[in-house]
Amino acid sequence: RRQRQMCIRDSQNSNQRPIAVMIDNNVGNNAHEGLQDSYINYEIIVEGGLTRIMALYKDKDVVKIGPVRSSRHYFLDFSSESDAIYAHYGWSTYAEKDIKALGINNVNGLTSNSAYWRDKTIKAPHNVFTSTEKIYETAQKMNYKTTTKDWKLLNYSVKEITFKDPADGEEDNRLLANSVSLK
């Protein structure tokens, strides 16, 4: 039986920079590791009708994430909108070009393999794993910032919002459309 280890950080929605990790979704009989601890998962169709997952992590120490796979360029917008450090093991031609052109802070296992390890009990290439700690350590060595002033990732307000009920004759807080244009 597997044990899952995770530690939630003390501060809720801190200024810690998120991590986006590319995860294989064609793992056969092998289980994903760490998906349950992410803030959000993006699943997008890649070549051959398969899907790949990009998981975003923030304010959690996750000790095993994977299996980590290569980057695809169509995930980069989702990673960038959260100012995430982008973690992957290899890349497609388009992803490599876009990552370099856009200056995306990325931890690539082909060049920064200290952030990754292989589980020898699983057949390659589905056996590469990482952790949030290893990604942050490697990002610091690469002089990437590990904090952010961008509060884009799931920054919910706890302020209560009340709307009046028109059924009770209350008409405030209505949103009126003064004009509608269809083209």
Each language-model region and where it sits:
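A surface/extracellular/periplasmic glyco- and lipid-processing/surface-interacting theme
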Residues: 5, 9-42, 47-183
